[in-house]
């Protein structure tokens, strides 16, 4: 048994990381400390003025662990890694831990390309971004390709190498064909320099140059060339308009601020690159209550830059905790100096005020929409409870369906709705293993048995501390089961539940002769529901969703089967070798006729795999 008092007395006087756990052994909070004994003890001292969030967390702490580190920076790095691994309930967690897209100019190549990427590496390329809007990156690259005759192929083209035949892009004037050695490296680099100028915000210089050339072309009566240059000027100006200039300097900077309403907090981030806003992003964190802004921003930075691909040169914030330590951590991650600054006045301060205003507006709009949706869903669940005469509102609803075509590839699906909203992360698919042919009842019995068998097994593992509560895929049981069918399907579900001594209400969703949702069957009776009411709309949505999910899984299995080849049945022939054989020999018949030497001439083939092919077609 965990002795809290004893463990608190024996905490070390060293830096490290502490992990708070609840009565299920689940990690609910990860923190770092300069001195472990001071930091951890603070949580359990009544004299401390804790925030509401910390008070709620402390009530749930059953035990804790700690890991000693050599320094505070090591503790910070370990803290970030453990938060990412365990996703604890009381840490700030960003739902969207994504890498933003960048525009990459591959300067390490003799003839560089302009591509989109989500990884920034030290490979000699020049990167522009990040861009929050992925479609914006795609649009800019497409506009660049229309304006500048640069290559788009992935070939390794070196100046002075053997010339190859140019592709269609050369024929239509979209590429200078470096592959055919039609342009020198130095001449091509001049084009790339213009692209870099454009992406760096110096598009006015390029426009001016194009205008001079357009005027010369018009004077020489080269009207077609002048029109082409005019179109390119329009494209360049369009790219320039996609990014609003708000600063005169050309640093890479992020501006981060927040707005709290006493319960929840919205963080807003503005990305400035070369003096231009290239994007902004917001994150809403619930139940922050009265946690102070400095702590919130410090925790947000750890989560945000722990997952994003790019750390800028300077980060501006209104206030922050552990500023020097976070700067050290960011610099280590970036592998070059990164600074956190708190502007007091001037242009930078004005931008932070603007960011905070955006955060306030975003949170208010979110709350308005959320409250409207919550009221709607609350009413639906309340009405559903009353219609079915349930003891409690069905917070978690699971719906099941079977899909098959002519008895082949029967599959089952389970969709989940929590508080009236679909929860795709809890959806599950089942491939039917024990039933041959089209038997929906037996198939349904199989998937329900597997669902609740897994659930009971996981619950036991959680109770035995062999599995964390958050790791269970089936351990949370529903308040209501909806079957896509009538009395037969309901009886199957009740039979399975009785086998496991589980008491969950089961309801059937029935359709009319036009395959439209008609009503519900519960306790052997059909309940007619107002077809224009919110409950009917909700039931129809659930029924459509479970059917869609089952059909999509069925299609994916049929798709895989349709691509089955004789080569799939040959030992030692995987996907790579299969593709290589078909690419080189063009057909199964040609592979059958191939000699041992011809098979070995394929780079991915070895002696054993060649022998397997010959043996198979003998």
UniProtKB/Swiss-Prot annotation:
Cellular localization per UniProt: Cytoplasm
InterPro entries: DisA/LigA_HHH, GIY-YIG_endonuc, GIY-YIG_endonuc_sf, GIY-YIG_UvrC_Cho, RuvA_2-like, UVR_dom, UVR_dom_sf, UvrABC_protein_C
Keywords: Cytoplasm, DNA damage, DNA excision, DNA repair, Excision nuclease, SOS response
Keyword Manganese: no
GO BP, sorted A to Z: nucleotide-excision repair; SOS response
Domain GIY-YIG: from-to ranges: 13-92
Superkingdom of origin organism: Bacteria
Gene Ontology CC: cytoplasm; excinuclease repair complex
Function: The UvrABC repair system catalyzes the recognition and processing of DNA lesions. UvrC both incises the 5' and 3' sides of the lesion. The N-terminal half is responsible for the 3' incision and the C-terminal half is responsible for the 5' incision.
Family: Belongs to the UvrC family.
Quaternary data: Interacts with UvrB in an incision complex.
Name of the protein in its database record: UvrABC system protein C
Natural source organism: Clostridium botulinum (strain Okra / Type B1)
UniProt lineage: Bacteria, Bacillati, Bacillota, Clostridia, Eubacteriales
Gene this chain is encoded by: uvrC
């Amino acid at each position: 048994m965990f002795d809290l008092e004893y463990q608190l007395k024996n905490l070390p006087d060293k830096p490290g990381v502490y992990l708070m756990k609840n009565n299920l052994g689940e990690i609910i909070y990860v923190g770092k400390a300069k001195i472990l004994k001071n930091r951890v003890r603070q949580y359990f001292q009544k004299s401390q003025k804790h925030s509401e969030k910390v008070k709620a967390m402390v009530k749930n702490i059953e035990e804790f662990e700690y890991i000693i580190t050599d320094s505070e920076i090591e503790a910070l790095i370990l803290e970030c890694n453990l938060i990412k691994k365990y996703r604890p309930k009381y840490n700030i967690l960003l739902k969207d831990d994504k890498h933003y897209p960048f525009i990459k100019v591959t300067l390490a190549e003799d003839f560089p390309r302009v591509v989109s990427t989500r990884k920034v590496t030290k490979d000699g390329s020049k990167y522009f971004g990040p861009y929050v809007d992925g479609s914006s990156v795609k649009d800019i690259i497409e506009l660049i390709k229309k304006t500048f005759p640069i290559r788009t192929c992935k070939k390794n083209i070196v100046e002075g190498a053997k010339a190859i035949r140019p592709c269609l892009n050369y024929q239509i004037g979209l590429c200078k064909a470096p592959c055919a050695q039609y342009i020198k490296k130095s001449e091509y680099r001049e084009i790339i320099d213009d692209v870099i100028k454009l992406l760096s915000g110096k598009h006015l210089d390029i426009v001016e140059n194009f205008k001079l050339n357009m005027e010369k072309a018009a004077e020489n009566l080269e009207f077609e060339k002048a029109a082409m240059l005019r179109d390119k000027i329009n494209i360049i100006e369009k790219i320039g308009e996609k990014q609003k200039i708000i600063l005169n300097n050309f640093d890479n900077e992020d501006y981060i601020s927040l707005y709290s309403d006493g319960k929840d907090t919205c963080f807003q981030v503005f990305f400035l690159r070369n003096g231009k806003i290239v994007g902004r992003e917001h994150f809403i964190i619930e139940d922050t209550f009265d946690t102070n802004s400095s702590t919130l921003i410090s925790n947000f930075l750890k989560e945000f830059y722990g997952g994003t691909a790019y750390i800028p040169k300077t980060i501006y914030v209104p206030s922050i905790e552990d500023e020097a330590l976070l700067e050290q951590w960011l610099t280590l991650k970036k592998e070059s100096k990164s600074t956190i600054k708190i502007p007091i006045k001037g242009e930078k301060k004005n931008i932070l005020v603007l960011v905070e205003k955006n955060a306030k507006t975003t949170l208010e709009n979110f709350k308005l929409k959320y409250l409207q949706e919550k009221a709607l869903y609350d009413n639906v669940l309340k009405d559903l409870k009353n219609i079915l005469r349930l003891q409690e509102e069905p917070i978690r609803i699971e719906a099941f369906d079977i899909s098959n075509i002519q008895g082949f590839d029967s599959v089952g699906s389970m969709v989940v709705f929590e508080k009236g909203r679909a929860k795709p992360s809890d959806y599950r698919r089942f491939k039917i293993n024990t039933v041959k042919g089209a038997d929906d009842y037996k198939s349904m019995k199989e998937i329900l048995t597997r669902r609740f068998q897994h659930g009971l097994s996981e619950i036991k593992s959680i109770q035995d501390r062999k599995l964390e509560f958050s790791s269970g895929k089936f351990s949370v049981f529903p308040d209501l089961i909806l079957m896509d069918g009538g009395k037969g399907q309901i009886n199957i579900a009740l039979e399975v539940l009785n086998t496991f001594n589980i008491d969950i209400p089961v309801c059937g969703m029935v359709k009319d002769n036009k395959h439209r949702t008609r009503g519900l069957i519960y306790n052997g009776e059909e309940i007619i529901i107002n077809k224009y009411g919110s409950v009917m709309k909700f039931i129809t949505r659930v029924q459509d969703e479970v059917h869609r999910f089952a059909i999509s899984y069925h299609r994916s299995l049929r798709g895989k089967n349709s691509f089955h080849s004789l080569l799939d049945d040959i030992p030692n022939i995987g996907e790579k070798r299969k593709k290589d054989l078909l690419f080189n020999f063009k057909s199964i018949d040609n592979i059958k006729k191939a000699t041992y030497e011809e098979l070995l001439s394929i780079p991915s083939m070895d002696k054993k795999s060649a022998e397997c092919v010959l043996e198979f077609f003998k």
